[in-house]
Structure formats: C-alpha cells, structure tokens
From Swiss-Prot:
Disulfide bonds: none annotated. Pathway: Cell wall biogenesis; peptidoglycan biosynthesis. Belongs to the glycosyltransferase 4 family. MraY subfamily. One of its GO terms (cellular component) is plasma membrane. The chain crosses the membrane at residues 26-46, 74-94, 97-117, 132-152, 168-188, 199-219, 236-256, 263-283, 288-308, 338-358. Keywords: Cell cycle, Cell division, Cell inner membrane, Cell membrane, Cell shape, Cell wall biogenesis/degradation, Magnesium, Membrane, Metal-binding, Peptidoglycan synthesis, Transferase, Transmembrane, Transmembrane helix. It comes from Shewanella amazonensis (strain ATCC BAA-1098 / SB2B). Its EC number is 2.7.8.13. It is found in: Cell inner membrane. This is Phospho-N-acetylmuramoyl-pentapeptide-transferase. The keyword Mitochondrion does not apply. PANTHER family: PHOSPHO-N-ACETYLMURAMOYL-PENTAPEPTIDE-TRANSFERASE, PHOSPHO-N-ACETYLMURAMOYL-PENTAPEPTIDE-TRANSFERASE HOMOLOG.
Length: 360
C-alpha cells in the first residue's frame, strides 16, 4: 500500500525511491509484523483468558501436558494479523502473488478458526468434523490451483524443479493442478500435526519461510535464476515481502509460545501457515525442496501415517504415541529437549535445501 504513496512522493524527494527496493520493504514488513505481534500479544492473551478460550488436552496424552489445559489458544490470530498488516503496508498490491497468498492465509485461517471455535467455545471436542475440514481445505486449494494454472504468464510457472538436476525441468501441464492441490493441503495438515509442543511448529515455519524469501528473491532476478538453473519468475520478488512478514509475525508469536507457552496458535495458525508454505513452494516452483526443508513436518506426518497403518494392518503400534514428538516425550525426554532438537534438525534440513540450489 505505502509503495504507491512512496512512488508518488518520489517526484518531490528522490529519497523515497528506496521503497521501490524489495529488500528494503521486506525488512520493513518483518519489523512491522514482529513489533505488532510483540505489542498486541499480551493484550490478546489477556483477552483470551477473560473469554476462557483455553486449550483442550487429550486425556490419553503425556501426563506432562495436563498442566497445559486451559492455556489460551487461537493465538494464530495474532500471527495472521501481523502478516496481513506487514504485507498490506509494504507489499505491492498490484501483484497477483500477494493476493494469492492473502487468500490462502485468510481461507485456511478461517477453516482453522471454525475448528478452534467449535472446540474451545462450543466445547465440542471433535471441533470441525474431519470430513468437512478436508472438503473446505480442498476447495480453497483447488481455487488456487486452477487460478494459477489458467493465469500462467511465463513457461517457468508450470515447470517442476528437481533438486540436483539442472537440466530436468519438465512441463507439468494439468498435473500442475494435482501437484498444487496436494502440496497446499499436505503442507497445511503437516504443520497442524507438528503443532503439539511449545514452539515446535512455529520455529521450523520461520526457518522455511526465511529460506523461501531468499529463493523468491533469486527467482525474481533473471541473472540469478539463470545462474542457478531455476525458473525465472517475473514479479516473484513480492513473495519476499510475504515470507519476511511470516518470519516477523512468527518470531513475535514465539516470544509468547516458547516453553512454557503463554498461548498456543491453534488450528487457525497451523493450518494457515502450513498452507502458506505450500503455496509459496508452488509459486516459486520448489515443491520438492519443501519436502527437504520442511522435513520435520514430513517426519511428523509420516509417523502418524505409519502408526495408523501399522495398527490397522498388524494390530501393533510402531511408536509409543504419534505424532513422533510425543513418542520421545513418553521415552522420558523433557519437552524442551524434544523441541530444540527438532529445531536443530529443521535448521540442518533448511540449509541442506538451500545447498541444493548450487549442487546441480
């Protein structure tokens, strides 16, 4: 929004031209989202406590989690508000990339909000019925998939980038819609499954978003894109603003979500952030790279799939409890140890993913 004001004021003072640089606006978006989250966090937590919007804890979960019962949840509203303000203030609102991301964050955030509302306000332990949650997620993801496919402006927008192979860039055709759908819905639910310990989901999300900020910047510059053998995507630089806003809002939320958490993000946060990461991966053509950099999310999801599959097929469980972070808790690991070690794994995987840009 302010980029247009700065563009107008440039004719009176050339110093305003600095706002035309994506990197400068990205820093401002990060700081804006961060400061908003830090400023409004205590107010939101206090309000949630007054409204008695507290976390519902499973009776069959680790005993250490019983003390979390009643901790304010739906803190994802703080994250989303910070992201929206950062993007709307410093993003180029003429960019379709920006509006796609705002739609994804808003739609998946609404799905998560309804789920949280039913759980903590209406005291329905099941929340939004899984079938309807999946249907709503699918509808939102398909809207994005069809829009992106039929609004393609550059061949690189529908290519599949395969890490380590610079000459393998197949055109996906209609498979683009299928891949986009599964990437967005899969990432949304993967982050949701990971959000089971204090700060466990938000820090890997911040790391992956920061990495995608760099990738979006490189993809938007023809020289860098050609050098790294990745698709050149004109205008993708605006995704840097979205990514840094996610980083800022995420770090601000982590201030209150770190162990022992004062607030949880709830589904309103985890579903929307996961969908956002999936959409960014699609927009910069790095779906496979998301699997690498978001390896913690993949690991958590696979542990649930394997646990359910093993129990149904063999009548035996592989892990003491799934997702896998609960397995380590039941083995006796203190919660902070599980969290930090998963953070370290996430950092390693993000750096590995970035390294693949050069290892081709």
């Amino acid at each position: 929004m302010l980029v247009y004001l700065a563009e107008y004021l440039t004719q009176f003072y050339t110093g305003f031209n600095v706002f035309s640089y994506v990197t400068f606006r990205a820093i401002l978006a990060l700081l804006t989202a961060l400061m908003f989250s830090l400023w409004w966090g205590p107010k939101l937590i206090e309000r949630l406590q007054v409204l008695q919007i507290g976390q519902v804890v499973r009776n069959d979960g680790p005993e250490s989690h019983f003390s979390k019962r009643g901790t304010p949840t739906m803190g994802g509203l703080l994250i989303l508000a910070g992201i929206f303000i950062g993007v709307l203030l410093w993003g180029d609102l003429g960019s379709r990339y920006v509006w796609v991301m705002l739609f994804v964050l808003g739609s998946f955030g609404l799905i998560g909000f309804i789920d949280d509302y039913r759980k903590v306000v209406r005291k329905d332990p099941k929340g939004l019925i899984a079938r309807w949650k999946y249907i709503f997620q699918s509808l939102a993801a398909l809207v994005v998939a069809f829009y992106l496919f039929y609004s393609t402006k550059h061949p690189g927008e529908t290519q599949l980038v395969v890490p380590f192979f610079k000459d393998i860039l197949p055109q996906l055709g209609l498979m683009f819609i299928v891949l986009t759908y599964f990437t967005i819905v899969g990432a949304s639910n993967a982050v949701n499954l990971t959000d089971g310990l204090d700060g466990l989901a938000i820090m890997p999300t911040v790391m992956v978003a920061a990495a995608f900020a760099l990738i979006a910047y490189l993809s938007g510059h023809v020289q860098f894109a050609n050098y790294l053998h990745i698709p050149y995507l004109p205008g993708s630089g605006e995704l840097v603003i979205v990514c840094t806003a996610i980083v800022g809002a995420g770090l601000g939320f982590l201030w209150f979500n770190t162990y022992p958490a004062q607030v949880f993000m709830g589904d309103v946060g985890s579903l929307s952030l996961g969908a956002a990461l999936g959409t960014i991966a699609v927009l910069v053509r790095q779906e496979i790279l998301l699997v690498i950099m978001g390896g913690v999310f993949v690991m958590e999801t696979l542990s649930v799939i394997l646990q359910v599959g093993s129990y149904k097929l063999r009548g035996q469980r592989i892990f003491r409890m799934a997702p896998i972070h609960h397995h380590y808790e039941l083995k006796g690991w203190p919660e902070p140890r599980v969290i930090v070690r998963f953070w370290i794994i996430s950092l390693f995987l993000v750096l590995l993913g970035l390294a693949t840009l050069k290892l081709r």
